[in-house]
């Protein structure tokens, strides 16, 4: 029915892709392809019942709040925010959505995967005994970099390369590794209270690769004391080619071990 993007080039290219898709007969938005920073408002106000928020996540809290104010059901891709202020805004908007009876879905597909659901249930039912530690990884290759185009503003360049700027992306832990962290939190039925870690840029440090790190290593503690008895989650995420790759979650128990993914 309608679609939009901050950049007109992106909006038009995506419309062309959908129009050439095998389900092209379902695409009926030729006159409702919007662009500009306010494109989300035009899409939401175009007469839709549900809106899919799949832009770079730095905009997500503002887009979600407007959709809820206009009474729309929402599917939004993870992550839902990139910082504390955005997260608090999102939580307040979600209270409004619940009060209005609106349906809200988030792109944590593992939560809906029958294999994950069954594995998590078995671990929680004691299949490997008491969980004593967790490991999770999103170690893989470096994402795309889109070159600057002549006449492109700095804002347009950053939106086009949103993954490499923290105000739009939130960095690797927030943008991708959140999938694996969510699985561990789901298994534990809790959130870590303490964390310590390190990160930096060893390979991805050129002038066109922004400010996000290419590796992080974090130790999370499910408990209130660093030195007390607690379950610890060891987390690794990295974008460096030619080294160990894994996108996975693992649970170590008092009676066994589970590869969750």
Model regions and ranges:
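N-terminal Rossmann-like dinucleotide-binding module
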Residues: 1-25, 113, 184
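Predominantly a Rossmann-like dinucleotide-binding segment in NAD(P)-dependent oxidoreductases
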Residues: 100-105, 110-210, 224-228, 241-250, ...
